[in-house]
């Protein structure tokens, strides 16, 4: 009789732990192409160099901030069209979710290529390629990877393995307006958008989103500790 009373508590406990696990493993991050300078022509820092300093995973999102009045459209293209700045047959033309804001969500691992919708602007450096890493489950007993395994891609002659996203689902639709930049990334000011974007832009301003913080994981640990304590107290009676 006593054991049958404990079953509902055990089931409730397992359900909560499942929710905590999902919460702690479903984080996705937002990156602004080019950092605070935005999607500009002739950037002070190459967009590809900016991408090498960041780590992209499946379900992350990249935002292209541009000035509509100077042809700041964004195209996803093949590698061949990326090399030649060909805009005639894009894989996808990114739609604006708000004025001057084009958004793309990475739904798989592997390479992605983006160029300006204006071929002349693409030739001046408004182009970007990104290598997206697959989401891999954490294994406590797994041996550490070699020192250079997770380093940045040094050139377009990369070597990578494409892993299907583990349990990845289609993310919810984006809101009609992207109201504000996330806490870990700053949107560029109006003065840094459009124009030539030449030598006046400092390299230090081309910062991407910093590495993810451990706030969600810490919260998950607190929740799990509280649940264990409550369950232990209930089983004492």
Curated annotation (Swiss-Prot):
Subcellular location: Vacuole, Aleurone grain membrane
Keyword Secreted attached: no
Record bears the keyword Glycoprotein: yes
Leader sequence residues: 1-28
Main location: membrane
Source taxon at top rank: Eukaryota
Name the record gives this protein: Early nodulin-like protein 1
Species annotation: Oryza sativa subsp. japonica (Rice)
Gene assigned in the entry: ENODL1
